[in-house]
Amino acid sequence: MIKRILLLLIFVSTISCGYETKLSKKNENNYNFSLEEMVFEGDRVINLKIKEKLNNYRLNKEAKNFTLKIKSTNSKVVTGKNLKGDPTNFKNIATLYVNVLVENNVKNTLKFKTSFNYYNNKNKFDLKKYEKNIKRNLAETMANELIFKLANIQ
């Protein structure tokens, strides 16, 4: 009984304190920047996910207006092998290089790097689907970081 009451008190106190995630739809309006143009180069899956996340800021006309030149890379590294020499562990590393331009002058150069470790799967079809999902998740993480950085550029 005490555990239930304690759990209820913790639940009520966290709801009533006004916690919001920093990238919620409600806070999206607080970011006072807009994107004139985005130029992509590199990995297609990563670029599509980042473009999807940044399109919300394209039509806004704010005081801070940026042009982005984005280059993305993705690599898969074998981190572990069994006695036969077959790979057992992998590491997927996604890197994003962003040049932030204001009136055709480079204002900032940003670099984001995320990685994810995972085990090999005997079913190669499932492994490819899993790797594509990992790539999308890494891209979404980097896109959220990029949005936060762009909002804080002076």
Question: What do the predicted segments below correspond to?
Answer:
Residues 38-63:
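N-terminal secretory signal peptides
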Residues 1-17:
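Sec-dependent bacterial lipoprotein signal peptides
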Residues 52, 61-133, 144:
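Surface-exposed short loop/turn segments
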Residues 22, 77-78, 153:
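Short beta-strands and strand-coil junctions in structured, solvent-facing domains, enriched
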Residues 42, 46, 88, 130, ...:
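Conserved acidic
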Residues 129-154:
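Short, well-ordered alpha-helical segments
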